[in-house]
Amino acid sequence: MAELPTAPNGVSSGDYLHRSIDQLRSLTHLTTADLRTAQLVHDYKPFNINEFRQNVVERLDYSLKNGLVHHQQQQQQQQQQEMLQQQQQHQAHQEQQQQQQQQQQQHHHQQQQHHLKSSYSAPSSPPTPHEQQEQKYDPNRSPQRPLMSSGSNASSPEDDRRGSGGGPGGGGGGDGDQSKPYKCASCSKSFANSSYLSQHTRIHLGIKPYRCEICQRKFTQLSHLQQHIRTHTGDKPYKCRHAGCPKAFSQLSNLQSHSRCHQTDKPFKCNSCYKCFADEMTLLEHIPKHKDSKHLKTHICNLCGKSYTQETYLQKHLQKHAEKAEKQQQRHSSQVAAVQQHVPSGGIGLNLQRQAMNDVNAAYWAKMGADSAAASLAEAIQQQLPQTNGQTYANFATLQQHQQQQQQQQQDMLQQHHQRLADTPGHSHSPHEDPAGEDLVLRQTTPQHHLQQQQQQQQPSPGPGSSAFTPLSATVPPSHLQQHRGAPAATAAYLYQQNAAAAAAAFPTQLISLHQIRNYAHQPGAAGLIAGDHLTLGLSAVQAAKEKAQ
């Protein structure tokens, strides 16, 4: 092997780097010139170990520095992660606090409802038995199912959807008890949720917390209030989807009932629940299901015939009838009060005087006897009776009956008066010989008086329908008018035809004196028929006739 050349400056050969065997082999083939060029190319330099160690230390320091920076970056990342975790924990803690507050509010609300239920007394409608006390719900004890009245078992459609008693899935079976453990203590219904049970118990307790701000009507459930508000706003969100049908409804149940009318494949409809069936046999099988059902309108109004499904609805309807009757009575009393304000304190007597002053006829008094004058006064009193009796007799039928009774009494009194006159010893039965103290009209012996009576007998009497004294036509004629008994049965006893020309000439000699009126008033038969207020009518009529004759 060729020896390696020694390094200059007395440096030992161990201080140089040794070449590999291949390099040495390649160097042997090179010339000296080539070696020089190779030395220049490879630039062989002597390497000092101290310098190498120093470089190594610097490299180690650099690596340490790089490691510290990386460690610091990791620490910063960890700190950021910890901060994020703390923020998340803080947010979770806030959410927990909010949930706790909500739970506390719910618990407080439930306590208030429980306090209201415990302190609330059940109203009269729906009716509940007096001997049974209110029972509160306790899930630990077995439910008691007392027999309640029909009004207390009232339930809403939502209660029927949430739970039903006695049927499949209700409170009567074993599977229903497991799926719906919350049972009502007042009825046989059961529910799957306690909130549904609390809403249902409001029906039995009569609690209606939801009030309409427009009409102040109260409801047990919020959904019922929302449906009721649509009646005020006119909102109808449920529209019929049938082609060409523009109808819309405020409630879904009404739309469902309406949609059945478009079903052509099911022509047989149930009148109780509006369900439709394809054949008649299925409908006949369905109808018995409504027996003892809440759909039947068994509560009927005796006044108008309307029927309702619940007794409470019938009571509200009857209350409307009572309010209407009260309003009619108030209106009638106000009308009577208005009439009384226009009538003076004289009452009926003054009204009779006004009527006599306006309608007096001189010939009428000239041809009247005592009986006809009394009959005219009685008829005038009868004409004024509806004004006075209208205050006390609100019913027209009773008023008419009362008037008939008074007419009958007056007729009886007239008959008694005529009988007394007939039984008088000095009484004459001739129509031309009247005593001076008996009648209101003076005794007439003039030829004009006989002429008038002959004309009255010759003139045909009108029918009973045209007479002003129809109520007295059926009475027995008095004893001093026996000449009329030969007349036909249709003629009246007190019918006179007026002759204005003869009466106007004969009237001044036929005036009534005041002492004769007083004597007539003091007679035993006439005192009960004509009062002192009505006797003033004759005097006022006489004065008016005098003025007219002058």
From Swiss-Prot:
One of its GO terms (biological process) is cell differentiation. Keywords: Developmental protein, Differentiation, Metal-binding, Neurogenesis, Nucleus, Phosphoprotein, Repeat, Transcription, Transcription regulation, Zinc, Zinc-finger. The keyword Metal-binding applies. One of its GO terms (molecular function) is zinc ion binding. Residues 141-156 have a biased composition (Polar residues). SUPFAM superfamilies: beta-beta-alpha zinc fingers. Residues 73-105, 400-416, 444-460 have a biased composition (Low complexity). Its main location: nucleus. SMART domains: ZnF_C2H2 (SM00355). One of its GO terms (cellular component) is nucleus. It comes from the Eukaryota. A zinc finger (C2H2-type) spans 182-204, 210-232, 238-262, 268-290, 299-321. Residues 164-176 have a biased composition (Gly residues). Transcription factor involved in neuronal fate specification. First required in embryonic CNS development to define the number of cells that express apterous (ap) in the ap thoracic cluster of interneurons. Later on, it plays a central role in the combinatorial code of transcription factors that specifies the fate of the Tv neuron in the ap cluster by participating in the transcription regulation of FMRFa in Tv cells. Also required for projection neuron dendritic targeting. Interacts with nab; which acts as a coactivator. Interacts with ap. Belongs to the krueppel C2H2-type zinc-finger protein family. This is Zinc finger protein squeeze. The gene is sqz.
